[in-house]
Amino acid sequence: MTTDNDTAAMNGATALIETLAECGVELCIANPGTSEMHLVQALDRVPKMRSVLALFEGVCTGAADGYARMTGKPAATLLHLGPGLANGIANLHNARRANSPMINIVGNHPNYHVGFDAPLTSNIDTLARNYSSWIKSESTESTLAQDGADAYTATLRQTPGSQGQIATLIMGADAAWGESQGPVAPNALPQRSKITSDVIDAIASKIEAGGKVALLLEHHGVSPEALANASKISAKTGCRLFTGTFPARVDGGPGNPEVERLPYFPEQVLQTLTGLDHLVLVGGEPPASFFAYRGIPGQLVPEGCTVSRLTQNEEDAVDALSRLADRLGAAAETVKTFERRVTPRPTGPLDTKSIIQAVAA
């Protein structure tokens, strides 16, 4: 952090980067332009945050998404006005769906310059609204640091449905170069809400009633701790465990809890779930076809299968599954894990199957 003597002359950009670094943001992936030059200088001044130049904005947003999935922490992106933001939107869509925490810092013209309709002027708010759970577009040099702290907090606040955890801070160049009061302290960290005992009892009763039951685990429900608790429930009750077709992240391989993944095509999903009497949602929604197909239902729940919910996406799935395991008497059960399989070297003609087998061996 800077000294008292330094903060008096600190500009908004440096106050913002100092604040984000104190919050715990360690990486900024940048494709800056003229409006973001003060941010680039600030990144050089704050060694606690590493900056990486990317030559295309989609790389910035895609890398930040991957970083968040692997670390659970937000990275920052630095993008140049509306066109730069637009170039990164495809991967921002993926990040929103994956509930990846991310902070987008988007440079903009000062308010007094927007009216001149310069070549890169656009409605950045409209672009950002498609995938952001938090937007701030009127920052000044005196609010920019606190806005950064609020953006960080927003990325850790789980939101209902598919709103995601992306914060977009649209920063006028004058807020970056203007004199600030220095960095601010991080906000208190948000916590996931916990479900009630009534929900635990209701789900336990459905599982204990008999019939074929499956847990569909998504988002927070596929963390290693959540999967371990789900595996104990499966060992005790015989219920099946599924993740969605494309989970944001799931730890597989030998030693990790065993879980099935739903296939891609709708006919295969329906076939996989055929015979189920009850499907329990742990985060996420009932499985749906990626596209509409003639003669195939959009929601892929077999006829006669009822659906209930243990947790919403924003609720604490680890705690819920742990308490459900206790309620079912499964806390002492052994977690079933993937085992290492020895893959023999292939023989015969070279084809797709033998190539994959050779790589695996």
Positions of predicted regions on the chain:
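N-terminal alpha/beta PP-like core and its mobile active-site loop of ThDP/TPP-dependent enzymes
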Residues: 2-344, 348, 358-361
